[in-house]
UniProtKB/Swiss-Prot annotation:
SMART domains: EF1_GNE. It comes from Thermococcus kodakarensis (strain ATCC BAA-918 / JCM 12380 / KOD1). Belongs to the EF-1-beta/EF-1-delta family. GO terms for molecular function: translation elongation factor activity. Keywords: Elongation factor, Protein biosynthesis. HAMAP family: EF1_beta. CDD domains: EF1B (cd00292). This is Elongation factor 1-beta. InterPro entries: eEF-1beta-like_sf, EF1B_bsu/dsu_GNE, Transl_elong_EF1B/ribsomal_bS6, Transl_elong_EF1B_B_arc. Promotes the exchange of GDP for GTP in EF-1-alpha/GDP, thus allowing the regeneration of EF-1-alpha/GTP that could then be used to form the ternary complex EF-1-alpha/GTP/AAtRNA.
Amino acid sequence: MSDYNLVGVIKVMPTDPDVNLDELEEKLKAVIPEKYGLAKVEREPIAFGLVALKFYVLGRDEEGYSFDEVADIFRQVENVESAEVETVSRI
């Protein structure tokens, strides 16, 4: 984890409240490119039973690293309504 100097928080909204979040989380973890790390995943209740997944993705402040790239990959996964980079911070 010490090789990373940035953390990007990516908020993923499932298509509906009935989506199995455990399965969706595992699918999303599997598509994160190898050069990135993952610090943690949190669940954030939104409304009407809908829960967002917040991925804390680790990267470096250098060319070739883009949290938008990871969000774009997440959007391609089945049962993902949206994936947006909320914040990027130095660590």
